[in-house]
C-alpha cells in the first residue's frame, strides 16, 4: 500500500471457554494486544474476550464500533474504518472463531479493500475448518450452507438437496444449527438421509468437552447421546454409490 492508512487485522475469537494461549498463536496475540480500535458484533462480549487476551491498553480506553448485522450492507466508511483512514490499525472480530466466515464481517473487509486499506488475516480457530479436518470426509471439495430452514417441507427438501449435491459432486456439505435445535436436526437427518450417507457432528470444538462423531446415518439412528445446547457443525457426505436406491 502506498497510502498512510492503518491496517485492518482480522482477529480470531475463541470458540468457547478456552484459554486464549491454547488456541491462538503467540504472534497473533502480540498483534491483537496492541490494537486500540475494533469493529465487533457485540461490545460487551468482545470486551470480555479481549480482557482475557491481556490487552496492552486499558479495556475502557479501547474503541468499539458495533456492526449492525441487520443493516450491514449500508456501511459508512468513516464510521466503521475511520481510525484506519487516520493512520491507526484496527481489528475486526467475530462473535466466535475467525471473522468473515458465516458472519457479516466480510462487508467490512470489502469496504476496506475499496478504500485502499490493507487487510491482514490473523491465524486462529475456525469451527468449519476444524470440523472438516476431523470428519474424515472429502477436504478437496466442500461447501458451507449456513443455517438450513427451520420448518418443513423446506427443511426436509434442503436436507435431501445436500445429499444429492454431495453425491453428484463428491463434495462435503457443511452447515450449522442453533444449539437448542441440535437434537431435532439430528432426528431430521436420520429421517431424510440414506442409511449409508455419512454425517459428522462436531461440538464444542477446542473446548475440554469437545465431541466429534463421524458415522453413517444407519449408525446415527442408534445414537443415545444429547447434543442439546452444544455449539456444533454438521457435515454431510454421500459418496457415489453403486446402489440405485436414492431419494426421488
Regions found by a protein language model. Name each.
Residues 1-69:
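Glycine-rich, flexible N-terminal cofactor/catalytic loop recognition
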Residues 39-40, 91-99, 172-177:
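Acidic beta-strand-to-loop metal/phosphate-binding motif
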Residues 9, 103, 107-165:
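Class I SAM-dependent methyltransferase SAM-binding "motif I" and its flanking Rossmann-like core
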Residues 68-69, 76-119:
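Glycine/small-residue-rich loop that forms an oxyanion/phosphate-binding "nest" at active or ligand-binding sites
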Residues 65-72, 148-152:
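Conserved helicase motor
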Residues 32-38, 116-120, 172-173:
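Short active-site oxyanion
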Amino acid at each position: 500500500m502506498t497510502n498512510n492508512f492503518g491496517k485492518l487485522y482480522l482477529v480470531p475469537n475463541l470458540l468457547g471457554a478456552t484459554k486464549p494461549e491454547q488456541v491462538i498463536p503467540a504472534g497473533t496475540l502480540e498483534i491483537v494486544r496492541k490494537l486500540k480500535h475494533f469493529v465487533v458484533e457485540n461490545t460487551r462480549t468482545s470486551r470480555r474476550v479481549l480482557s482475557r487476551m491481556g490487552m496492552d491498553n486499558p479495556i475502557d480506553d479501547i474503541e468499539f464500533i458495533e456492526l449492525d448485522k441487520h443493516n450491514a450492507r449500508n456501511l459508512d466508511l468513516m464510521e466503521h474504518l475511520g481510525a484506519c483512514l487516520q493512520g491507526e490499525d484496527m481489528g475486526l472480530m467475530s462473535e466466535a472463531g475467525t471473522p468473515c466466515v458465516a458472519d457479516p464481517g466480510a462487508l467490512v473487509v470489502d469496504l476496506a479493500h475499496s478504500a485502499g486499506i490493507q487487510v491482514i488475516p490473523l491465524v486462529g480457530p475456525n469451527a468449519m475448518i476444524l470440523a472438516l479436518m476431523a470428519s474424515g470426509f472429502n477436504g478437496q471439495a466442500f461447501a458451507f450452507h449456513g443455517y438450513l430452514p427451520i420448518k418443513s417441507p423446506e427443511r426436509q427438501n434442503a436436507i435431501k438437496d445436500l445429499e444429492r449435491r454431495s453425491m453428484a459432486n463428491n463434495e462435503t456439505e457443511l452447515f450449522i444449527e442453533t444449539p437448542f435445535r441440535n437434537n431435532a436436526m439430528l432426528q431430521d437427518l436420520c429421517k431424510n438421509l440414506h442409511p449409508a450417507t455419512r454425517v459428522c457432528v462436531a461440538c464444542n470444538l477446542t473446548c475440554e468437552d469437545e465431541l466429534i462423531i463421524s458415522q453413517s446415518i444407519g449408525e446415527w439412528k442408534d445414537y443415545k447421546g444429547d447434543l442439546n445446547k452444544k455449539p456444533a457443525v454438521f457435515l454431510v457426505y454421500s459418496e457415489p454409490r453403486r446402489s440405485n436406491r436414492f431419494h426421488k
